[in-house]
């Protein structure tokens, strides 16, 4: 043994394992006897032999532990190392992304489609309020109820199918040919476990409802056949029979009681639940039809008579079942009507502005909300221009547009044209002679040159994914926090708030005009049936508001031309009148007859000036007005000096 070469720790371990197996073979019979003598029949001879087998040697244990230590160190190093998609967190020239750009949602919370509005719990109340003002809220409510009916009906049908399967499995007879050693104990234990649970016991007591008399008789006979089998099992296994004797003796009584209960019970709970589910489906379908589709409905949806008959046929099916898709076609028609007639107006209404204000003031504004909303992107581009980083935004917009066009064509695009467009972006932002260099490193530039742009067949749609990801992260981590705390962001919010107030002011005046016409507020507008009449009434109300709008408007004097101060309607002294030398009170608040009133309010004059600008005609008109004012002032002074001279002569 000393001269034998050391086989190594692994071989030593396997040899000791083989010795343990030999000992297991030789100690099979004695270990079985020992297990019987200590009254432990549950422990097999094989498990007892494995307990006596020798373990690995200390050399093998040390070798295995060394391997485990090295594996744990490598695993720890792998965990500490950043994944392949996790690039460096520093920004450098343009920054690195720690996000997967492909997974970024190209959706903005500030711009929504109709489907997104109907499925968003935040903006949906604003849309319902808008439709209520137009008296079209029944379209939205029908779509929501039909969508809820569609989803809940399928879930109820699945529940009904599961209950049917459970009922059929519980009604299966017990086979009398189950002959194995421990048959009595599992059967009785499962029966007791099912009877211990209240719901299972109730189901078992009433499981045979709907089965004919022959099936009930066969089930009773099958249950009764268990008792001789249990006697045989007790003869083979005395210990197991002792533990389950009481349960096996009660088996025939329980089966008879179950059979009698099944005969006496009027209905099964499973069938009752299934029946209630199907009745609830029918009730919901009838309620929706009565509220929105029936000709007698208060506000029916705009569908044809043929479509109404088709919905009736799907609700009252030949098999007695309601089709879950009975309202799908009507949903599509209502959806297209809302999208074509109302949704564009909703996006321009103060209701959607209120929703945008709620999103912008929620504290969770993301970069996608800004980049995919035109109004927010306008203010963001101004901020990026002030920060001398507008080239990053322009690159992102151009590259994203480049990638979206070939992707929309699903591979059917001109490779040469795509390569020319990609070269324009490369020459502008990536090359060493770039006109607007963004600071991409050599790795990114070589990747775009060799692998993406110079590819046979043209560049792939995702050729600018890496620089797009870097530009996205730079804007998100560096510039987005500054924009959200800048004055331009608050100006954007202020503009939204002013637009909401203006729209509410117009809506309030229109409602007052409708009430003043003599009709009650709940009735439709008098000109609701005539679109031209309604439009003319709205125009009249808006003109009336604009005439008095200069009283409430706040004008920044610094933004106006100082010469416009001479264009005031009442440019006299800040007095109501004066007393002459003769003691006569002369009113100055009355306009002079030779001075013409300026047409339009301050708001209209400001709008004219903003539209016309500093043109030659405007300057000439302003000069004539100033000259007239000077002449009138001289004439007034001459008239004031004339009574004094006459009194001196006297």
UniProtKB/Swiss-Prot annotation:
Entry's localization field: Mitochondrion; Membrane; Cytoplasm
A GO cellular component annotation in the UniProt record: mitochondrion
Gene3D superfamilies: Regulator of G-protein Signalling 4, domain 2
Compositional bias ranges of the Low complexity kind: 525-535
MF-aspect GO terms: protein kinase A binding
Pfam families documented for this protein: RGS
Role noted for this protein: Differentially targeted protein that binds to type I and II regulatory subunits of protein kinase A and anchors them to the mitochondria or the plasma membrane. Although the physiological relevance between PKA and AKAPS with mitochondria is not fully understood, one idea is that BAD, a proapoptotic member, is phosphorylated and inactivated by mitochondria-anchored PKA. It cannot be excluded too that it may facilitate PKA as well as G protein signal transduction, by acting as an adapter for assembling multiprotein complexes.
Domain notes: RII-alpha binding site, predicted to form an amphipathic helix, could participate in protein-protein interactions with a complementary surface on the R-subunit dimer.
The name this protein goes by in its record: A-kinase anchor protein 10, mitochondrial
Lineage: Eukaryota, Metazoa, Chordata, Craniata, Vertebrata
